[in-house]
């Protein structure tokens, strides 16, 4: 499993501003007009983890290396994207290459910033993107179904089983049900789903981009999204892109902390977003530490201790004999 999250949304919802703040770069053009991003921009960020800092102090480590997560800034989708509107097919293909989806929503009013739908309604915006992902998946699964139907004429039992699963997927998509909401799959179904790479099977979190004054507790629009996300079984994070852009310009952590304190914020919204992305990918962390460095390592959840050892060095996976738990909680 890869470790990357695609940042998606309608055009001009400040995705690129968030991406630039996340990666502390200006790699993605951010402008007040749709489709200022065409090609996806990629950047890696460290996952904030207080445990690693504590361990580095205990080990007197010279260097601290955090777990890394890749974010991909993908151009905005519009109605009809699944039919090619606004270069939609290209952008949907970019999303298909990611492991999880971070859906950025505009949750603030500002007459100086245009909205492609000409009004601020985040739930409507969610439904627009969801519809395009569903339609793209349905087109993809129908192609797979036609291909399997031809092969099934040979009487191959395995092909027939695959065809049954594909038909089940298609029926859910036709009902308007994202695949991630449907859990009645057996192990073989899960494997086929994984290989099918459905957009709506990817884990998802909503990011509510609010005005500066609402960064601490959100606003009426973000609360609508929080309610929707809870019913949807998805996560929700409140962020002010304007604040995050300012923080990214500060050099020292002390300056950042002081700035956050003046705004009544305990931490940067992007830290919450990074952790949410990490959680979406179903990852776990383990640590190594010594005088030279303290490092966080990343593994898929339910990995074994030998697999973890193999991340450090391939020989360790073959020769690991024993592992003990820490004597103090982290």
What kind of feature is each model-predicted range?
Residues 26-33, 57, 155, 175-185, ...:
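Active-site phosphate-binding and catalytic loops of NTP-dependent enzymes
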Residues 1-85, 89-95, 101-103:
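Conserved G1/Walker A P-loop phosphate-binding module
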Residues 213-287:
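Canonical P-loop GTPase G-domain recognition
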Residues 75-77, 115, 123-129, 149-155, ...:
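Short hinge/gating elements
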Residues 266-320:
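Functionally critical, mid-to-C-terminal surface segments that flank or help form catalytic/ligand
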Residues 194-198, 308-312, 316, 328:
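N-terminal cationic and glycine-rich segments that engage phosphates or anionic surfaces
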Residues 321-330:
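Single conserved hydrophobic/aromatic residue that forms the stacking wall/gate
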Residues 88-238, 243-244:
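Conserved C-terminal guanine-recognition region of P-loop GTPase G domains, centered on the G4
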């Amino acid at each position: 499993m890869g470790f990357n999250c695609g940042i998606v949304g309608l055009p001009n919802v400040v995705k690129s501003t968030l991406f630039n703040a996340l990666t502390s770069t200006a790699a993605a053009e951010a402008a007040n007009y749709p489709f200022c991003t065409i090609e996806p921009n990629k950047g890696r960020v460290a996952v904030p983890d207080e445990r690693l800092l504590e361990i580095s102090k205990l080990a007197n480590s010279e260097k601290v290396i955090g777990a890394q997560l890749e974010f991909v800034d993908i151009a905005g989708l519009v109605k009809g994207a699944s039919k090619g509107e606004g270069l939609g097919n290209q952008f949907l293909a970019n999303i298909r290459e990611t492991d999880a989806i971070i859906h950025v929503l505009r949750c603030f009013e500002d007459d100086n910033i245009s909205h492609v739908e000409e009004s601020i309604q985040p739930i409507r915006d969610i439904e627009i993107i969801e519809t395009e992902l569903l339609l793209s998946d349905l087109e993809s699964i129908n192609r797979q179904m036609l291909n399997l139907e031809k092969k099934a004429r040979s009487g191959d039992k395995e092909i027939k089983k695959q065809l049954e699963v594909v038909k089940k997927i298609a029926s859910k998509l036709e009902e308007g049900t994202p695949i991630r909401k449907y859990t009645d799959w057996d192990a073989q179904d899960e494997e086929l789903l994984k290989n099918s790479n459905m957009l709506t099977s990817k884990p998802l979190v909503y990011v509510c981009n609010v005005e500066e004054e609402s960064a601490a507790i959100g606003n009426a629009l973000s609360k609508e999204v929080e309610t929707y996300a809870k019913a949807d079984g998805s996560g929700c994070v409140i962020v002010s892109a304007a604040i995050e852009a300012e923080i990214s310009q500060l050099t020292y952590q002390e300056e950042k902390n002081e700035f956050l304190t003046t705004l009544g914020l305990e931490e940067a919204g992007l830290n919450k977003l990074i952790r949410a992305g990490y959680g979406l990918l179903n990852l776990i962390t383990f640590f190594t530490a010594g005088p030279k460095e303290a490092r966080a390592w990343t593994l898929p959840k339910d990995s074994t201790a030998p697999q973890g050892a193999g991340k450090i060095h391939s020989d360790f996976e073959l020769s690991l004999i024993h592992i003990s738990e820490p004597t103090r909680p982290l």
